[in-house]
C-alpha cells in the first residue's frame, strides 16, 4: 500500500498540481496585496473615503467608527467595503489567469493535421474514388494505377 501511494504521488500530474497550488496561493497573496495596498487606497481617495475595508452598514442601528468596533459591540454588519475588495481581487486574478492562459496557448505549438487524401474521379462513372483504389466502389470498373 505504501508503494502504491509513493507511485501515485510521484506521478507527474500530481506533482504539477502541487506546484501549481503553491504558486497559485503565493500569487493570490500578491494580487490581494496589490488590491488592498495599491488600488483600493487610490480608489478610496478618489471617492473621498480613505479605507474601503471600513465601509459597512450596521444592522443593529448603532453608529460605529469601524467594522471592528461594531463587531466588538456585537452588532451584525454588512461589510460591503470588504466585499468590494474581495470582488476586485477575484476580477484581477481572473484577468491575469486569462492572460496567462491566452499567452500559453499562443506559444504552444499546434500540429497541423495531415491533409486529407484528395480523391480521384472514376473515368467511367465520374464518382469520387480513393487515390489508392484499383477498382471503383460505385461501378466496379477496373482503374489504372496512379503513378
Curated annotation (Swiss-Prot):
Q: Which residues cross the membrane?
A: 8-28, 81-101
From the record, what ranges are coiled-coil? none
Q: Where can this protein be found? A: Cell inner membrane
Q: How does it assemble?
A: Homopentamer.
Q: Enumerate the UniProt keywords alphabetically.
A: Cell inner membrane, Cell membrane, Ion channel, Ion transport, Membrane, Transmembrane, Transmembrane helix, Transport
- What PANTHER family does the record tag this protein with? LARGE-CONDUCTANCE MECHANOSENSITIVE CHANNEL, MECHANOSENSITIVE CHANNEL MSCL
| Role | Channel that opens in response to stretch forces in the membrane lipid bilayer. May participate in the regulation of osmotic pressure changes within the cell.
Q: What is its main location?
A: membrane
User: What is the source species?
Assistant: Trichlorobacter lovleyi (strain ATCC BAA-1151 / DSM 17278 / SZ) (Geobacter lovleyi)
Q: Which Pfam families match?
A: MscL (PF01741)
Q: Name one GO cellular component term.
A: plasma membrane
Q: SUPFAM superfamilies this protein is in?
A: Gated mechanosensitive channel
Q: Which family does it belong to?
A: Belongs to the MscL family.
Q: What is this protein called?
A: Large-conductance mechanosensitive channel
For molecular function, the Gene Ontology terms on record are: mechanosensitive monoatomic ion channel activity
Q: Which NCBIfam families match?
A: mscL, PRK13952.1
Record membrane topology? Multi-pass membrane protein
InterPro entries given for it?
Mechanosensitive_channel_CS, MS_channel, MSC/AndL, MscL_channel
